[in-house]
Amino acid sequence: MPRLSFLLLGAFCMTTFVTPAIANTDTRAALESVAHLDNYQVVELRRYDIAPGQRDRFVRYFDAYFPEAFEQLDCMVFGQFEDRAAPTKFVWLRGYHDINARPIADAAFYYGPVWREHRVKVNALFPGASDNVLLLHPLAPQTGIPVLPAVDPVDEPHGARGVVVAQIFAVKKGDEDAFAQRAQAAFAHYEGVKVHPTGVLVTLDVPNNFPQLPVRTDGPFLVWLGVVENDAALKDFEASASQVEHALAGTGMLRGAPERLVLDPTPRSRLRWWPAAEAKSSP
């Protein structure tokens, strides 16, 4: 399948979390502390089926052991979430600097000491296959997922807050570029809604270079990500989201109805409604 052009969203306006002109000293320091954690050009959107009644337990294991373990291998856990619509679903986003870094980091983790110590307990919590995985990359350089500072247990004693929304569009082969253009115009309607856009990603059409972890081959897909502050903001946003989905479904370029995930960040998810983000602006 052809790769969606990096050029199509050159003018795409992503609402930023915070700009230097308005950031206070603490905010600038926090952003500078993660400035080296950027340029992740390969992203996995991973969805797991957890055993009934075991998701809270799985979340505690994941939050406690895995984010830093991946970061030490030079990859990134952008965020991890509970799917509101399905009490057995766990969703997370993992990033790599490039496709060649993926098998190196995965081998180091899955054959390394952290996973070897905890895999029996963790695997018991999702006994089914974990192959609902989209291999993606940013549609344009400015539409990658931002790396936010880690949750601060002092300033954020209740953990990550906000609601993450993912819109997933199954695009017909051959219509990738045309659909991206239409999506660009449609997503512009979110500019008047209190939402932080946090990424536009598309299928990465390359062989799976770590076959021990399957990825889906039924693409292409386009994925939009955003964060709202709370349920009230989510309600306001969902009206706009429905309009966008209806408009894009009407293009005739999709293989099925758009899918929308409403995701609650786990306590330690980096991708969240970050307090400093409330002083946001658009470039």
Predicted regions and their residues:
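Compositionally biased P/S/T/G-rich terminal and signal peptide-adjacent segments
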Residues: 26-39, 137-159, 199, 276-281
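Bacterial N-terminal signal peptides
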Residues: 7-17
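Surface-exposed interaction/gating patches
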Residues: 45-52, 57, 140-211, 216-229, ...
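Short, low-order "capping/linker" segments at domain edges
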Residues: 212-214, 270-279
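An amphipathic, aromatic/His-enriched active-site/gating alpha helix that lines ligand/cofactor pockets
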Residues: 24-38, 60-79, 86, 95-139, ...
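Short acidic/glycine-enriched loop/turn segments that link adjacent beta-strands
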Residues: 85-88, 207
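Positively charged n-region of N-terminal signal peptides that target proteins for export
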Residues: 1-4
